[in-house]
UniProtKB/Swiss-Prot annotation:
It is a multi-pass membrane protein. NDH-1 is composed of 14 different subunits. Subunits NuoA, H, J, K, L, M, N constitute the membrane sector of the complex. It is found in: Cell membrane. It catalyses: a quinone + NADH + 5 H(+)(in) = a quinol + NAD(+) + 4 H(+)(out). Its EC number is 7.1.1.-. GO terms for molecular function: NADH dehydrogenase (ubiquinone) activity; NADH:ubiquinone reductase (non-electrogenic) activity; quinone binding. Belongs to the complex I subunit 3 family. InterPro entries: NAD(P)H_OxRDtase_bac/plastid, NADH_UbQ/plastoQ_OxRdtase_su3, NDAH_ubi_oxred_su3_sf. NDH-1 shuttles electrons from NADH, via FMN and iron-sulfur (Fe-S) centers, to quinones in the respiratory chain. The immediate electron acceptor for the enzyme in this species is believed to be a menaquinone. Couples the redox reaction to proton translocation (for every two electrons transferred, four hydrogen ions are translocated across the cytoplasmic membrane), and thus conserves the redox energy in a proton gradient. It comes from Moorella thermoacetica (strain ATCC 39073 / JCM 9320). The gene is nuoA. Its main location: membrane. GO terms for cellular component: NADH dehydrogenase complex; plasma membrane. This is NADH-quinone oxidoreductase subunit A.
Amino acid sequence: MVLQQYGIIAVFLVGGAATAVAALATNWLLRPKKPPEGDKLAAYECGLKTQGPTWIQFKVSYFLYALVFLLFDVETVFLYPWAVRFQALGLFAFAEMIVFIGILVLGLWYAWKEGALKWL
């Protein structure tokens, strides 16, 4: 019985690896044979010649918000099973979850205090 369950997992792992290898092999077979040159490597701005430098540096702050979102999204993954089994788990699990949420709120407060969540 246990071997059959591991067999299913092995089939999925082999299938996933085969799909990835097939995608990479197809990409390699269909790629252009000669490297691009000339206008293909030039920056494109609506069909016109570029005006000014094409590579400008700008600050992207989305990753900070994405990181905070990911943190609290993972928190909900841990909170949901606990909430479903709340009555069966008892007071000790409630105290553990309060500590878990407290640590996350403390981290959010620290990031906010340090200015990590400022847009610009």
